[in-house]
């Protein structure tokens, strides 16, 4: 059996590229939240100015239209950025799954194992059947080979 989640969390691919992608996603989400707050605050401020009679209805309408354009632009940009991040996450996940699959195939190339299971489905098993460390080592080996091949 293989502890797939452990392999994916501990492999070099995740440590180098996965963590960076996760940080990039979190940074984008914080940026979106901040931008939304700023636009909402701008709209509230405009409403307060209008209610206090500090701005004409004509100016208020012009500023409201300006805010609406900013919101539309923000939403469009955020959507594009989210799609890019989704695609990057999709590619990253596929690469990780491919490395895992290739590692298991290489480890079992001699047909030493008749069945290899994901440990998440196990309730109890003999720990001598755990091939997680071997799979992790092979995943890292394949990742290093892939990185070396990309540089050529």
Q: Model-flagged regions — what are they?
A:
Residues 1-152:
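Amphipathic, charged alpha-helical segments and their helix-to-coil junctions
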């Amino acid at each position: 059996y293989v502890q797939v989640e452990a392999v994916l969390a501990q492999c070099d691919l995740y440590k180098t590229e996965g963590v960076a992608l996760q940080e990039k996603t979190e940074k984008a989400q914080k940026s979106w939240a901040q931008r939304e707050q700023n636009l909402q605050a701008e709209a509230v401020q405009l409403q307060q100015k209008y209610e206090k009679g500090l701005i004409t209805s004509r100016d208020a309408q012009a500023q409201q239209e300006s805010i609406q354009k900013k919101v539309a632009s923000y939403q469009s940009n955020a959507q594009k950025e989210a799609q890019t991040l989704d695609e990057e996450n999709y590619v990253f996940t596929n690469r990780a799954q491919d490395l895992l699959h290739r590692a298991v195939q290489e480890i079992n190339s001699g047909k030493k194992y008749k069945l290899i299971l994901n440990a998440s489905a196990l309730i109890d098993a003999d720990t001598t059947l755990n091939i997680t460390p071997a799979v992790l080592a092979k995943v890292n080996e394949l990742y290093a080979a892939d990185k070396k091949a990309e540089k050529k």
